[in-house]
């Protein structure tokens, strides 16, 4: 029977190796939005301890096309009735987050959020751009699923590993509050993307990540966890960029990502003691991948990398501060509501 320490060490190595391999493959294959594939691979490696069967992988690709394609249905409404369209997007985000926290598939919920925000925002400006984003997401998912399968084949869980204990179910009232909070976190980035979807697409991905992280964050720790993980991700992206500048090639890109991934994976799986939840380290690594991926693309396009990074990091911080404010205000409102209605079911702070 393998020890818990051995299982965690194997999973940390698998997460770091898979994420690094997917990042290098995504840029090596010149995918249209290269940071999407490693983000999906990171999410799947952190969420699943078993590889997806072949049929399930194809089914997931079909689900991605259907769920992201749902954003295309909102484009005419956003064109002709923008206020109604925005409110409908907000309602759909609430329902999707509620579905994800009620026991639904977390990957499907993520794809639906992306479809409602990225696809509809891109299509509101240019329908062809929305189709390109869908194609990019499908390609990124296929690459991520392939890399995840290779990672599980190279580094499977030790024989005899016990399945994880199921998380306790939340009450319906608590799920609704958490879903409302997550939807309000995502909405400002969606409104920004309606202005210029090509420029604000990374902000949408960051806000989706924050929305998911906010469901496991309390008002007491919101600033430390949400803002702290964003700042740590930005700092790691800067260190990664200068380290990569020493030897600029795809092989070193993979090795540096492997090193950074191992450092954070040790924290994520509790191999190195710390005071932060796994979501903090996962959000930090996701933020680093988004910022780093955009910087590499800016450099390849001949843009001013440092100015673009400063602007993007500033927007990330603003979005994170807004998320912290939403967590704090909604938690305070919920506490006042429970205090004024003592017969209502009490719930711990979100």
Task: Report the location of each language-model feature.
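Alpha-helical transmembrane segments and their membrane-interface boundaries
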Residues: 1-108, 121-258, 266-350
